[in-house]
């Protein structure tokens, strides 16, 4: 699933090509995504212009003249900018055609993505108003994590992946941040002190920042808006490296399922 760095990479890729452009037409080939694409979307968007491209957690916010498109890439979604004469593929479900002969094409093989429309403040939309703070903003720090982890019985890994606690931290980057912080993913969130949470907040920010700079992580099918893979996979310390030696101590990296998600850790370096 595209996580925060991948979504931010897409945002940066499409923004300069959308802002100021008018929407000529909208083509919906398959409306049955995670939630059906609203039938009114086609008519609502024609003639509007893009004003900005934002992000909240893993959601893209395409601000238009009269409202906002809220788009989630789901498990396998991608956005590409193509010319209008580019043949569409089997999983190209939506085209937003611009007035310059190009179109924003949404591809989603597994159809877990979503495209919503709101004319109200998008941050008050039910999908967004429940989200915790952005992990790269100042509100997200060790004091915040310590305060919100008290009396929680969940594991620290599940805790930092809870989008109500912090927006956009998925499985890949949770594994990496916990490794760099030296915290075992199974450790109870309520049994971690302030100093260790300060370290975890720092490593989370570092991992996410570095991933954004590398264009995200491509493990299976993530591509940037210009069709290129993300290169942070080359920098992963622990994710996907089961039985490989720990880059710090050489102990074989262990893999187990925690909360139905693949969790990688070093038995010597993480406690």
Curated annotation (Swiss-Prot):
Cofactor binding summary note: Binds 1 zinc ion per subunit.
Pfam families listed in its UniProt record: Fapy_DNA_glyco (PF01149), H2TH (PF06831), zf-FPG_IleRS (PF06827)
GO molecular function: 8-oxo-7,8-dihydroguanine DNA N-glycosylase activity; class I DNA-(apurinic or apyrimidinic site) endonuclease activity; damaged DNA binding; zinc ion binding
Record-level GO BP terms: base-excision repair
Gene3D superfamilies with a match to the protein in the record: 1.10.8.50, MutM-like, N-terminal
PROSITE patterns registered for this protein in UniProt: FPG_CAT, ZF_FPG_1, ZF_FPG_2
Protein name as annotated: Formamidopyrimidine-DNA glycosylase
Organism: Nitrosococcus oceani (strain ATCC 19707 / BCRC 17464 / JCM 30415 / NCIMB 11848 / C-107)
């Amino acid at each position: 699933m595209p996580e925060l760095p991948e979504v931010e990479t897409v945002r940066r890729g499409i923004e300069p090509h959308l802002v100021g452009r008018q929407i000529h037409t909208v083509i919906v080939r398959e409306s049955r995504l995670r939630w059906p694409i609203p039938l009114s979307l086609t008519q609502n968007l024609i003639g509007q212009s893009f004003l900005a491209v934002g992000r909240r957690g893993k959601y893209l916010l395409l601000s238009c003249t009269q409202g906002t498109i809220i788009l989630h890439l789901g498990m396998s979604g991608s956005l590409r900018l193509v010319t209008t004469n580019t043949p569409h593929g089997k999983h190209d479900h939506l085209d937003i055609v611009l007035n310059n002969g190009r179109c924003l094409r949404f591809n989603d093989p597994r159809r877990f993505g979503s495209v919503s429309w709101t004319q109200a403040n998008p941050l008050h939309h039910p999908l967004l108003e429940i989200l915790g703070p952005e992990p790269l903003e100042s509100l997200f720090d060790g004091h915040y994590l310590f305060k919100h982890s008290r009396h929680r019985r969940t594991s620290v890994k599940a805790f930092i992946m809870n989008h109500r606690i912090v927006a956009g931290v998925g499985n890949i980057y949770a594994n990496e941040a916990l490794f760099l912080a030296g915290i075992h993913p199974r450790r109870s969130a309520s049994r971690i002190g302030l100093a260790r949470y300060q370290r975890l907040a720092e490593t989370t920010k570092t991992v996410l920042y570095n991933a954004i700079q590398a264009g995200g992580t491509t493990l299976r099918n993530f591509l940037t808006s210009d069709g290129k893979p993300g290169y942070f996979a080359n920098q992963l310390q622990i994710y996907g490296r089961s039985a490989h030696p720990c880059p710090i101590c050489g102990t074989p990296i262990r893999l187990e399922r925690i909360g139905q998600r693949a969790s990688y850790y070093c038995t010597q370096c993480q406690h």
